[in-house]
Each structure stands twice: as C-alpha cells, then as structure tokens.
C-alpha cells in the first residue's frame, strides 16, 4: 500500500483539500488523518494531486505514430505522454489506405492483449477518417477519403478487437445517417468533424446518436449569422461534447473563451491532437505520408495547413487557466472526468474517489508534471 500524505488533492465532489490518499491498484482511502500504515510517496510542498489526464484524441508522440502500426510504436507513445500526466488515451488514426488502417487496428489489439503496465493505458481507438468531407480534409490525405461504409468500419473494429470508441465523420455525406445509427447501436461515439455540415445536418445527426465534435473550430464549417454551421451548432446544442486543442495556435484565446461561455462545464474536453513530433526536437516530421515542418510549437504541411499539434496536456490545462480564465478545477475536469464520461470509463477513472483506479498526475505550481501514477504504479517521475 502507498500513500500521498497530507498534501493538496482534487477530491471528487469536494474540490481541492489537504488530505491523505491511500492506494494500491485502486484508491483505498481518502482521509484527513495522516496516521496511515502505507509507504509514503514524498512530494514537493507545492504539489497538487489530480486525476490522471485522459486524451481521447492523440496521433503520436516521441517520434512514433499510431498509424505506424506496431506494438513498439504504441508503447513509445504511451511512455512519452506519461510525462505530461496522461494515464489513459485513444490511439487515433487518420485517413489512409484500408491496409494501413487495418494494420494500425491490429497493433492496438495486440498491444491491449499484452496488457502492458508501462506508460499510459490504451483505452481503445479514435478512428479519425476516412469517412469525412473532402473539402474539409485538413491534413488528411485526399486520395483515401471515402463515404461512410458500415462493412469497412466493422472490419476495422474487428481487427482492433472491438476497441474503436470514437469515429469522426462528416454527417452531411451520403450514408452518414445509417452509419451513425449503427455506431449508436453498438455503443461507439459519433464525433462530428472534418465537415461542412449545416445546422440541419447536425440536428439530424444528433437525433440518431451523434454526441461529440472533433477539434471544434478546426476543419469544419464556420459560424455565420445566416447559417451557423458546425461551429455554431457545437455551441448551440448541449447534447454535443466539444473537443478543443488549447495550444492557442489551432484556436485563439477569444474563440476558446466563447466556447467556454457557451458550453455546459461537462461538455468541453481538452485534447492534444498531437502528432509524432511531440516530445522530440523541432525539425522535419511526417503525418500520414505527408511531410510536416515543426517549428516553435507549430506543426504544418508545406502549404501551411496545421498538421496536428505538439501540445502537452498539462500545458493545455495551464492555457485554459492562465490565458482563457477558466477556474483551475474546471480546466482539470476538461482533461479528466469529461473525456472519461464520453468514453464511458468514468466509473473507473477521471476523478479521485475511493474504488476508482489509482491514476494520478501530480503538478507543481508551474504546471510541471512531478509524478504520474497509473494503477498505483509510478509511470513517470521528473
């Protein structure tokens, strides 16, 4: 048994409080008393113990990408993102050939079957593409974009060991409505993204089960006073949980403030949407077979299109607090309990509560990650 003794902890339902947390693989006790029989993990005086971060949209890190399609590359991503406090994540794909997507799915199945205890936990897959709108492909390769195909999806899902948790698609394209119904029936989250959808398209999508918006503001129809598009609909409909890349590059600070003011506190989720260059020096990188130039925290294709981020989740939380003006615990919720609810794993992770998994990220006053713990095991220490 281990413990964090007499330190500041973000406790589920109680906010920030000085207490002692006793844990093994799961959280055993949260107490005001520090006279517990457990091995203390010493922390700095300014430490704050938070739930482990949950990243539902990340392509890669540490020089590896989920589309590389190997167990080894997934392991590198998992270990790299532990250093930013992430304890659970979805391996996120992109629009590619069926062969490459299937290869990536197979690697996820193999990795999860092996049940690695190193690095962040792979909860499943976020299938971003190929079922998107060509006109809003962003950094997704055009030649592999296709209309929603239930049989193709089922093949990918089977290859993954039924691990697909989210599918990004454009609801306005032919076949989308039946596809969303299928996803809803099997418990997979439909995320509206890479889309030119109008408000009416999104209303129809919500009616058959769509519940998430992929990297809100980016690669989607903008808000206009005569047609509010995807961005306006994301803010209008409380049924939609909105992902946001809070690096201040993909989305400006005022745009983030607008989103915060127009979404319920439990309907906004921080993502990194990071690509393989996260955690390694600037230079030339790759995304989906395309050359990416990484400089000063920005990843772009040759034509200037943003190609994912190199954002760390602890810095996303910091940006929301210090630049957007969100209360600290609310910003933490955006990176923990909100995505956990979307992925239907909030009974296990996403908050610090007796009986939940012992997943923690420990930050100092500068938002640096001091320690990351998953299932009671230290997976990163500064």
Task: Give the residues covered by each predicted segment.
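Divalent metal-dependent hydrolysis catalytic cores, especially in the metallo-beta-lactamase
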Residues: 59, 75-104, 120-133, 160-172, ...
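Histidine-rich, glycine-flanked metal-binding segment
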Residues: 1-5, 9-50
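Conserved, mostly hydrophobic/aromatic
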Residues: 127, 183, 213, 320, ...
